[in-house]
């Protein structure tokens, strides 16, 4: 600790302690699960070609009769504009002149201010991506709060691909509900509606705290694990995350891995929290291979040096005023999260 003039009496000194830093919670479950694959486009839009394969069922005919004939696969093209997101900051001499550095007894420097600005910038980009991906999973729409692309109402992946969102009410407030039957509805729907050429072998449910708590305390679940000696021992200890960080409780039941996601966007400690998963809801997705089912497309920056180049996840540029009066930091990211197979995202409700 170093002595500094007291704030109450300029003729006295007090010790400056180590700083107490309050940091917003940082969430990134979609990144940890690897739900979205990443693709990079060189243009400001992406065009998806949908090819629908088909097979025929042969019938017997008399010899010499006209043969059954085949046909080619169906296909159609869809084009979607990539939204443009920007976040800028700047530094002036007044931000440094005569200022004490954060948590130190030295004068502020340009490098320290720049480092803080870039740290906040990186955090903003990461928070935006997590919020955007969860928004797409929960609503079936890309994150475009101002609807700058997709018309007045924006894109809706269920409408764009001609699918209907499947929902299952787990009726967790009813003590006699058969949870396994409810889980089987989700599993059967994914198997029947996959159309990916693959097999849905397991399922992940990203749950709100309310859904998760009602699930693990439901009488049929408690009874099923009453005499189960192995992990998880839900009757004797708090569930713990396996493979993720300890904030994410998880519970495997009925071929579904339920993960509690308490996360939400909160710009500053104590500020308003915009939850990722609405209260009492859960989002069910296939447990593996989702990087080909759900995609994040990145487009290039709006700069000459990046024209027609593969898009990066984020860009940052620094410009110094020729007169030395300010330093400007520009950043941007251009992305769209697409549910290529929206029918494989199932909405679950606690009641």
UniProtKB/Swiss-Prot annotation:
It is found in: Virion; Host cytoplasm. Its main location: virion. Transmembrane segments: none annotated. GO terms for cellular component: host cell cytoplasm; viral capsid. It comes from the Viruses. Keywords: Capsid protein, Host cytoplasm, Late protein, Virion. Homomultimer. Assembles to form an icosahedral capsid. The assembly is primed by the interaction between capsid assembly protease and portal dodecamer, and major capsid proteins assemble cooperatively to form the procapsid with the help of capsid scaffolding protein. Major capsid protein forms hexons and pentons of the icosahedron. Viral genomic DNA is packaged into the procapsid through the portal vertex. The packaging triggers a dramatic reconfiguration of the capsid shell. Belongs to the lambda phage major capsid protein family. This is Major capsid protein. It comes from Pseudomonas phage KPP10 (Bacteriophage KPP10).
